[in-house]
A protein has these predicted regions:
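Short alpha-helical transmembrane segments in multi-pass integral membrane proteins
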Residues: 1-28, 85-152, 198-254, 309-374, ...
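Hydrophobic transmembrane alpha-helices of multi-pass small-molecule transporters
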Residues: 69-72, 184-189, 218-222, 293-296, ...
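Small-residue-rich hydrophobic transmembrane alpha-helices
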Residues: 57-117, 154-173, 283-347, 378-400
């Protein structure tokens, strides 16, 4: 019986047997769809605001890093909870799984207090660092105060989504994002422009629509969590904060917070370098909204590729592991090539969606073409980073993330702005991405001579 079970087992898991391209697409498409919805959330706000007032668009471009920081804290902590809950469920330790989920909701309060204080006291100084234009500062204050002071909805929604995912439920978290995004898209024009019974509220209206979308997403998630989910139960009845549970959550969660915060720090740095031109700051803001449509599918792809590489590494199937890496890179490059072609062929139309002024158009068109040269090397770099995570080389993936988004790009951008002017800053993107890819290839070659070399031995 034992032998029979062993002979059957390899056929049970599709990750070891299914044709590779089909397997990658099957595992990646739900994540790609989910990530694209998140990208849509960001872009819709900006399109409506840009068509309402160019100063409003500049203000929300400057506000964007703080929104990213909020998501980094919320999602990073939630990743820690997800890891803890899924491990305890695997161990059949349901009491600790429930306790972990309850701790997760309590950490939402910690995170919320941080961003409530930022919303109340830090918004004006933050906006004033970048611009003396009072209209932009005031729009930024309106937008950020609402988004940060009501961030509890977003923080709880992200936590509950990740907790549901820990139980293997991928569909409802995706639906909650979709529901929130649709509500946001409906209320954005109504509240910004004042359509029908709604007053014209401009940038403030965009903030309210965003928060209302997050509130609806949170309510949807909580309803599923409390009424449709039988795996994990939250109870505050005899709840006590447990230091070792919190430690287990943050051991995984804190590095994830750091990884996700890097992008926020990078944009704050680039905004400071570009501060000599409001139009350049706006162009960077528009670029980041649009590039999320290209990068988010790639991040969705890596969520599908990671377990495939990890599984085949564990099963010592070197050929399949390399096949997953190769096909992952090819699919990633195809996604990024489409993005590059669009940035080269229709930059004017892309910028015009945001109601771009002539000034923004003059800076934005060449900027988009230059920056998009980084897309294809970035695709390969992202999949290599996924490989390092999948085979347990987390430090290499952390080094890669730091290099891509901080260590290389900011010094290069600063030097280019000093030697030439702010219009040369855009070249920092492809230069940094190219060197990051070289580093990734060096790491990979090192692994092929070390850890991966021994994978053949058991097969033969």
């Amino acid at each position: 019986m034992g032998n029979m079970e062993n002979s059957v087992k390899p056929h049970e898991n599709k990750m070891g047997t299914m044709p590779m391209t089909r397997l990658i697409l099957t595992m990646s498409l739900p994540a790609i769809f989910s990530m694209t919805i998140q990208a849509m959330y960001n872009v819709v706000d900006s399109i409506f605001i840009g068509n309402y007032d160019a100063d409003g668009l500049t203000a929300t471009s400057l506000a964007y890093p703080l929104q990213m920081l909020l998501i980094a804290f919320a999602a990073g902590t939630a990743v820690g909870v997800n890891s803890f809950v899924s491990r305890k469920l695997g161990e059949k330790n349901f009491v600790q799984a429930n306790d972990g989920a309850t701790h997760g909701l309590v950490t939402c309060i910690f995170n919320y207090v941080i961003f409530l204080l930022l919303g109340l006291f830090a918004v004006r100084p933050f906006m004033s660092m970048y611009t003396q234009n009072e209209a932009i500062v005031n729009y930024g204050i309106q937008y950020l105060t609402v988004v940060l002071c009501f961030s509890f909805f977003s923080i709880v929604q992200i936590m509950v989504e990740k907790t549901l995912q820990a139980t293997g439920n991928m569909i409802f978290p995706m639906l909650s994002q979709l529901f929130g995004a649709i509500v946001n898209i409906i209320f954005d024009p109504l509240l910004i422009f004042g359509i029908g019974i709604f007053p014209e509220m401009g940038v403030l209206g965009a903030a309210i629509a965003t928060v209302f979308g997050q509130f609806c997403g949170m309510v949807f998630c909580l309803c599923i969590f409390f009424f449709k989910n039988n795996e994990v139960k939250v109870s505050f009845k005899h709840f006590k904060l447990n230091g070792s549970t919190l430690k287990s959550i943050y051991v995984v969660g804190f590095p994830s917070v750091i990884m996700q915060s890097i992008g926020s720090v990078m944009i704050i740095g680039l905004n400071a370098i570009l501060a000599v031109s409001e139009a350049a700051v706006t162009v960077l803001g528009i670029y980041y909204k649009l590039q999320s449509f290209v990068f988010m599918p790639c991040f969705g792809l890596n969520q599908g590729v990671m377990p495939i590489i990890g599984y085949n590494y564990g099963a010592r199937k070197k050929k399949r592991m390399y096949s997953a890496l190769k096909r992952g890179i090819i699919i990633g490059v195809i996604i990024m090539a489409v993005g590059t072609i669009l940035m080269w062929t229709i930059p004017e139309q892309l910028i015009a969606m945001f109601g771009g002024t002539q000034d923004i158009m003059d800076i934005g068109v060449p900027a988009f073409r230059i920056i998009s040269l980084c897309f294809i090397p970035a695709a390969a770099g992202i999949i290599f980073t996924t490989l390092f995570q999948a085979v347990g080389k987390g430090l290499r993936s952390l080094i890669m993330s730091f290099c891509r988004q901080l260590v290389l790009i900011l010094p290069i951008a600063w030097v280019l702005s000093m030697v030439f002017d702010y219009t040369a800053v855009w070249y920092a993107f492809p230069i940094a991405e190219f060197f990051s890819l070289m580093l990734a290839i060096a790491f990979f070659v090192n692994l092929t001579k070390g850890d991966f070399k021994s994978l053949d031995q058991k097969i033969e």
